[in-house]
Every structure is written in C-alpha cells, then in structure tokens.
Amino acid sequence: MVDIIFSSSFLDDMGDHSKKKSGLAMCVGCGSQIHDQYILRVSPDLEWHAACLKCVECNQYLDETCTCFVRDGKTYCKRDYVRLFGIKCAKCTLGFSSSDLVMRARDSVYHIECFRCSVCSRQLLPGDEFSVRDEELLCRADHGLALERGPGGSPLSPGNIHTRGLHMAADPVSVRQTPHRNHVHKQSEKTTRVRTVLNEKQLHTLRTCYNANPRPDALMKEQLVEMTGLSPRVIRVWFQNKRCKDKKRSILMKQLQQQHGDKTNLQGMTGTALVAGSPIRHNPSVPGHPVDVQAYQPPWKALSEFALQSDLDQPAFQQLVSFSESGSLGNSSGSDVTSLSSQLPDTPNSMVPSPVET
C-alpha cells in the first residue's frame, strides 16, 4: 500500500510549524533526502521519491492507484510480482486467480483441470488414490503397472518412483488458503490416511454390536478392537458413519411417507384420513324408559292358528296370507282388500292375539 504525505520542508515553506516532522525524510530508492512536495510511503516505514518508486521489471511508476510489492529491497507491480514469485500450477505453469480452487500433491499445486494422471490423462477426483513420480501424477492403475514393469529396467522402475505408497486426493481448496511452498512441503510430509477395507467377519461383528448398542462405551470398544483386530480410530469412525447413515435413512423414509400420504387423490378428489374419536359415556339425563319384552309373535301367527281351528274359505285365506308375505298388499286395489275382508268372519274379542307366556 502506498501512502502520500507532505514533505516537512514543504510544510516549513508554508509556515505550518505545527505539522513539522522530526528528522529528515530519506528516499529508500536513491538514498538522498526528499525535498519534494509529496512523499510516497510504503508500509510500514519506507519512504520514496515519487520518481524513484517504480517496478524494477517494467519500470511502471507506483503510486496510490496501484499495489506495490517489496521483496529483498526491490519494488514490483502486482503483475510482475505474481509472475515471478506467485504460486503457479505444476502442470501448466500458469498462475492462479484469487477465486480459483486448487489441488495439492506434496509441494506442488495444480488447477483442478490439470490434476490428471500423466499416463492416461484421467482426471483425479477427491478420494482417488495416486502417486507422485518425478513431480508427475500417476493414478492407481498406472502406479501398479509401473511397479510390475520395474524389474525390466523400464523408465518407470521403482527406483524412479519417489513415493511408492498411494496418496488420497483431498478436496479442492481456495488458492488463498494455499500456504507458502515450504509450509506446503511440511504438511505433505505427514502420513496420508488410506481407507480401511473391512472383511465380512469384521462387518458382522460391528453390525451385531451396533444393533445391540449404537453408542458403545470405552470397554465395549476395547473388546471390539480385540475381536476385530481394527484400530480404535477405525471402530470409532465406523460407528459415527453408521449412526449418520441411519439418521439420514430415517429422515428420508419419513419424507417418502409424507409424500405418499399427500398423494391420496382420486379423480381430482383429495382423500382425507378420518380418525375415530374417543368413546364417550352415556348421558343419563336423556329421557327414556326401559321396555320389557317377554316374547315376540309374528302378526300372522295368530291368524294362522285361527284359520286351522275355524271353517274359513281356504282360497281366500291363502290369498290373504300371500299378500302379507309378498308385501304387495299396498299395491292391490281397494276393491280386492274389501272383498277379502268381507269373506272373513267377525273375530270375537276372546280371540284377539295376546302375547304368549314362555
């Protein structure tokens, strides 16, 4: 950052003694005293003549309108500083913008599109295993072929492979998060963790314990270490991943059930689930009287018994019974009913049907 301040000698000429600075302003570029009207100051305390502050590569004058970089006592503009000292892609040797995402392998930085196998040109994605040979990337398949062709003395012999072990590609990071090369090299010296593959017996043991207790205590984990032969970290991570997967699966099932319940539409009509309410008690305040039913006798039973005991005209009686059974009495004409009733004798009061005691 370049700041512009007034020179002390210029302030003396203006008669402003209150703003006079103690000491003399010396130019860092030429080493002489600054008597100009303006002084260009580069943070924190470097002062320059306006004519001395320029890029050592392109001789562009640097002022408050541009960014100034100082390295080893030399000043650079932003373009030349990035070109000379900025982080470059190990594949295409081009620089990075502030918004680029990069991939790292040991002390090298790559564009995402440049992070490819040098043999088959397959792009290496996060999670893929790779190796580094002479600052070049090899995928897992080509790394195995290089090891197999080693005894033949080919250029891809194990002696030329600096890293026999496979690394796992990490997620891309912002170029702003990429540290200096020396710092990157220190981080890359750490052992890269490789995914552990479990066999059927180990999986069965872990699943059985998970079904019994999804959150085992320290004692149970120690027993699992002895039973499976896995490290405590692998067992802890497996249980964490298992709980996370089950939680996601349960949330997904609830969403599917909710969506299935919302789709209860039939020919444009939406079905609504009805839920039966709780039973309520009988309200004794409702008026009512109990009825004692001792026996029930069909209405035509007494008439049939009377017909068997009396001398009635059988055809007329059968016609009357058929009317009562078929329910067609209401559809008959009034003359028929009158003719049938005229043929029946008068029934004495003593013959009125009464309930039969049982």
UniProtKB/Swiss-Prot annotation:
It is found in: Nucleus. Residues 27-80, 89-143 form the LIM zinc-binding domain. Residues 191-250 bind DNA. Residues 325-358 are annotated as: Disordered. GO terms for cellular component: nucleus. Keywords: Developmental protein, DNA-binding, Homeobox, LIM domain, Metal-binding, Nucleus, Repeat, Zinc. Pfam families: Homeodomain, LIM. Residues 336-358 have a biased composition (Polar residues). GO terms for biological process: axonogenesis; exocrine pancreas development; neuron fate specification; positive regulation of transcription by RNA polymerase II; secondary heart field specification. GO terms for molecular function: cis-regulatory region sequence-specific DNA binding; DNA-binding transcription factor activity, RNA polymerase II-specific; metal ion binding. It comes from the Eukaryota. Its main location: nucleus. Residues 325-335 have a biased composition (Low complexity). InterPro entries: HD, Homeobox_CS, Homeodomain-like_sf, ISL1/2-like, ISL1/2-like_LIM1, Znf_LIM. Binds to one of the cis-acting domain of the insulin gene enhancer. May be involved in the regional specification of the myotome and also in target recognition by the caudal primary neuron. This is Insulin gene enhancer protein isl-2b.
